[in-house]
Amino acid sequence: MEFFQRYIELDRSWQHNFFYPLIFQEYIYGFAYDHGLNKSILLENADDKKYSLLIVKRLITRMYQQNHLILAANNSNQNDFLGHKHKKNLYYQMISEGFAVIVEIPFSLLLISSLEGKEKKIVKSHNLRSIHSVFPFFEDKFLHLNYVLEILIPYPIHLEILVQTLRYWVKDASALHLLRFFLYCNSLITPSKSISIFSKRNQRLFLFLYNFHVCEYESIFVFLCNQSSHLRSTSFGDLLQRIYFYGKLEYLVKVKTFTKDFRIILWLFKDPFLHYVRYRGKSILASKGTSLLMHKWKYYLIHFWQCHFSLWSQPRRIYINRLSKHSLDFMGFFSSVRLNSSVVRSQMVENAFLIDNTIKKFDTIIRIIPLVGSLAKAKFCNVLGHPISKSVWADLLDSDIIDRFGRICRNLSHYYSGSSRKKSLYRIKYILRLSCARTLARKHKSTVRAFLKTLGSEFLEEFFTEEEKVLSLILPRDSSISRGLYRGPIWYLDIICIHDLANDD
């Protein structure tokens, strides 16, 4: 925190979220550059200047000139900035990254200040940062629930909606106007441009705007859930200090969009067992209620997005499923509630009884077809799952080739270790091992059989995870305890993102 404040003075203007002066500070773009390389906001050396501040000022000045706006809107190839189209795109990207750094600052400071003096709570909630922590929650809660809503959160049809959401937090009109100018100059806020184009070219800024937009929606949604439930949910980092949220809440009550009495809305959705989980653009709303209650939630969410956030969502983007009959497609797994029957023989004196027990079990299965498709797209196998050589890596050193394949295999094994059925995971390992062997054999102009015979067991050890190596040293592979550990689901509390090959959404 002190290191961060060394670069940014928190004076009175900053306390009111005035960002415009920061746009002309060169170290802001150094932060953005360093974050792109090292995934770190702060620079080790603040004097290492990555960009030219003069070029940034020139570009911002031209953005305010009407002639330049006309040229940008018409997609003209003449009179490109600095005479080179790729340089213009470079500095547009540079300003985009700078904007993202600037707007992230107040929310980072807000989160840090709100957690000061709460070290014990931070330690307790540290493991919740892992996306794997969602699945133990499913195992604990979903066994007692009946229905689930699988929700695809709609994207805004216009980037202006994302910018307007910032007005509740950012009071600097100049910064907001400049952000709009930037989007117009880059031909992003136009009917002919898709929002997906912006998200690919300006990932960091788009992700911030979109996540902030979803945070605003979830703030009101969590409030409604709290009012309709006997149990109060716990607020975490993205729901802290909702000063402006309560202002919007008053507006929501005054409008009375769906009924004359706000309490009637809450009575319609009275449910003491309601659970909500979201990852990226997909969320799950699970309940112990009836099918009628879930249909009410479905159409309420559709009208809620449309009336208060200008988001058009079609009913088919929200699926209502019964947990006992359908599987959840979430975060690379098919999750379902399975019934396990067991017969127990009980002997009492001269009488014997057969007791049939049915136990619910939360089951997780790897989505093997999309994962094999991702491996085929990355040229590790064909569309049928048959391993092939990675020709683009054939010029690397042998150690680098083995290290790359081994790292991918370990990462996927680490993430999919929670699967209840390991057969699909073994298939993925087989594809990567044989693809690695064929790549090395192609490099040395040899056969796979001869190459594997030369390397022996040392080659296979590169594809083992650290946990598998430790277990193999402590327990024999054929022991009952070892088989139980290898076959059972294992959830890790240090996974903060999904591997690119596993993320096929």
From Swiss-Prot:
InterPro entries: Domain_X, Maturase_MatK, Maturase_MatK_N. It is found in: Plastid, Chloroplast. GO terms for molecular function: RNA binding. Coiled coil: none annotated. Keywords: Chloroplast, mRNA processing, Plastid, RNA-binding, tRNA processing. Pfam families: Intron_maturas2 (PF01348), MatK_N (PF01824). One of its GO terms (cellular component) is chloroplast. Its main location: plastid. GO terms for biological process: mRNA processing; RNA splicing; tRNA processing. Usually encoded in the trnK tRNA gene intron. Probably assists in splicing its own and other chloroplast group II introns. Belongs to the intron maturase 2 family. MatK subfamily. This is Maturase K. It comes from Portulacaria afra. The gene is matK.
